Each structure stands twice: as C-alpha cells, then as structure tokens.
Amino acid sequence: MMCFRLSPVSGSGLVLSCLLLGAVQSYAFELNLPDSKATCLFAKWKMNFTISYETTTNKTLKTVTISEPHNVTYNGSSCGDDQGVAKIAVQFGSTVSWNVTFTKEESHYVIGSIWLVYNTSDNTTFPGAIPKGSATVISSQSIEIPLDDIFRCNSLLTFKTGNVVQNYWDIHLQAFVQNGTVSKEEFVCEEDKSVTTVRPIIHTTVPPPTTTPTPLPPKVGNYSVSNGNATCLLATMGLQLNVTEEKVPFIFNINPSTTNFTGSCHPQTAQLRLNNSQIKYLDFIFAVKSESHFYLKEVNVSMYMANGSVFSVANNNLSFWDAPLGSSYMCNKEQVVSVSRTFQINTFNLKVQPFNVTKGKYATAQDCSADEDNFLVPIAVGAALAGVLALVLLAYFIGLKRHHTGYEQF
C-alpha cells in the first residue's frame, strides 16, 4: 500500500490520509512508500511550476502556474529496482507529470534528473496555446547524500529551463531507507547553510525581553570580468541581501561557490552581474565621474522569494565606493548599500576595482576609513576654531571686567 498526503501550506489542520484539495496557493506533498510493510522511501516537499506558452492571440505569451494539484496520482513511484534506481512520480491529471530519480551507490545515494512533462493540448490549463502537444523539460541534478541520511533543504531552489521555472522548498527526503526507519541524521543543502530568516517576535500581555537573531556573515567571493584576454574588473566581497518587503525580513547570504558571474567593461562604465538558482540577476554598475574617480552608480536585482514570487528593484542614482581612477576601493568592515526602502546590500571584506586593472591585480586601495578621516578632519578643525574663539571671548570679558573695576576704585 502507498499512502500520500497533501497538506495546505497555510497550516490548516485538515489532513486526509491520501489526498486533500483546497483553495490555497501551494501544497506540501508527503510520500511514505513502503516495501514489505516497512518504509523504503520517504519524501515531504513543496513545489510549483510556472510555464510560459505562446497563444493564438497575436502570438502573445501567457503564463500559468501549476500549484493547486487536481486529480493527483503517484503511479510509477518505486523504492528501487535491481539496478538500484528509485523514483518518485507525480501526475496532475492528464496534463502535467513530474518525476525524480535516485541512484544507490556503495556509500551514498544520488538525486538524479528531474523530469517535467506538460501537454498544451489541454485547453483548460493552456487556453489558446500554440502549438498543441507534449513538451518535456529535464533538469539534471547530481546531489550526493550519504546512505542513512535524510536530505533537508528548506531554502527555495529554483531551476529555470527555457520557458519553465520550477520552484522547490521545505524538502525532506530519504531514498533507500534502511530497516524501515527514517533517519534523524540530516544532510543539509548549501543554500540552507547560507540563508537566515528572521522570525517575527510574538508579543504576550507582558512582553518578555527578546533578541533578534544575528545572521551569520556571508562567505567572501572573488569575482572578475575580462575584456578579451585581459582582466578589466576585480571584486572581492561577502554579500548579504536584505529584503524587508514582507512582515518577516528575508536575509540571504550569497554563496560564491554556487554563484555565476559575468559582466562587461567600457571606458565610462563597468558592470558585474551575479546569478544563481535564487537570484535571476544582481547587477553592480560602476561609472566614472569628473574623469578622475569611479563609484558605484547603479544596482539592479531580481530574485525569487520563498513563496515563489519574484522581487525586483533597480536604482541608477547611487553614490557608493568612491575612489580615484587607477586605485581600488577597500572596506573590511560591514557596509550597507541602501538600494531602496525595501532592499539593501550588506558587504563584508569589500575590495573592488572596476577600471584600469593592470596584470589582473588590484592597485593601491583607498580604504573606507579614509572617508571617515576626511569627514572627521573638518569637524576637528571646526571644534578647535570654536575653542580658540571661546578663549578669546573669555579673555575679552575678563579684561573688560577688570577695566570697570579699576574705574570704580579710582
């Protein structure tokens, strides 16, 4: 017997042993697959798919999100065959099917390819779609998990292939379960190691003292852009993205090992673009001012949130990281780049040179502490002048008082 459970994300207490349908945006899937009356494959996860397709109306694009499963079946799910291959298979009626495979090795198991098949001939799901027919999207994975460990990834994992975006989160799964007991040992995905979500504080009648969790600092990454065979831009920095659009702030540390980078260099501007499974793009655009300095002029970002929505912000009127041309800008302490009211970037151990890179190495750095010194010098000078003026006035009034006293004695 196979038992499946679908429970609403909203936290409703209604749970059916095999299927629950309701008017919510996405569902948590749970599969407890037995073999000889003992669990051999366990999985609990959330997912949705966004598919863009061409329509007969002036060949415009429409988008459909598959997030409310109807007529769901799990035919074809298996604990493993003679070749050591297990599979989870999900069918959303006759329109969409999804499956993922697992391969058993000597000391670990591997999450393999994810297959998504959809049929645009279904006019209910894909009204006015052209052309009609079946389409297959394959997302190749190769995640190795130790045997007897359960894989956990609460972070949003996004895979974009062509016109299809797949979102997965709150994943807990174990293939090839030993002795029917799901493991308590977790193998945590890299994204969970670098994401911290600050929980809201729940106030009682007499609020107890609370502290806001401090997110871990991000890993420092090295990024570069080339123009032909020569490096034209260098950047070293740890990046922490802060989104405050929702009631619960979302804090995301960029992991350099899973982040791609590209860019371009021009005489007056330079661009560094970062992207990964969660960030569609994060652009840093530098510009030359007064033909003697460079600065960070623009930041553009578009990223997927935990609920599958897309958060986008752009600001082309910034003024950060100012330094003379021919030098680099450095700031080892934490800095905040406020891009908008709802988005900021915290940088750690920053060093950047977007122009005049020679032999692929940083030039002499302008330290951000110099900015503070430049700010403090006029304050110190002003304070000194104010002190001198106060002494002069004090001496004047003392002399004036003595002068009057002399007249009275005379």
Curated annotation (Swiss-Prot):
Topological domain spans for side Lumenal: 29-375
PTM description: Extensively N-glycosylated. Contains a minor proportion of O-linked glycans.
Chain spans, region First lumenal domain: 29-192
Membrane-crossing residue ranges in chain numbering: 376-399
UniProt-listed PROSITE patterns: LAMP_1, LAMP_2, LAMP_3
Region feature (Hinge): 193-228
Main location: membrane
Subcellular location: Lysosome membrane; Endosome membrane; Cell membrane; Cytoplasmic vesicle, Autophagosome membrane
Side Cytoplasmic, residues: 400-410
GO biological process, one term: protein stabilization
GO molecular function, one term: ion channel inhibitor activity
Assigned keywords, A-Z: Autophagy, Cell membrane, Cytoplasmic vesicle, Disulfide bond, Endosome, Glycoprotein, Lysosome, Membrane, Signal, Transmembrane, Transmembrane helix
Assembly: Monomer. Forms large homooligomers. Interacts (via its cytoplasmic region) with HSPA8; HSPA8 mediates recruitment of proteins with a KFERQ motif to the surface of the lysosome for chaperone-mediated autophagy. Interacts with HSP90 in the lysosome lumen; this enhances LAMP2 stability. Interacts with MLLT11. Interacts with ABCB9. Interacts with FURIN. Interacts with CT55; this interaction may be important for LAMP2 protein stability. Interacts with TMEM175; inhibiting the proton channel activity of TMEM175.
PANTHER family in the cross-refs: LYSOSOME-ASSOCIATED MEMBRANE GLYCOPROTEIN (PTHR11506), LYSOSOME-ASSOCIATED MEMBRANE GLYCOPROTEIN 5 (PTHR11506:SF35)
Protein name: Lysosome-associated membrane glycoprotein 2
Record lineage: Eukaryota, Metazoa, Chordata, Craniata, Vertebrata
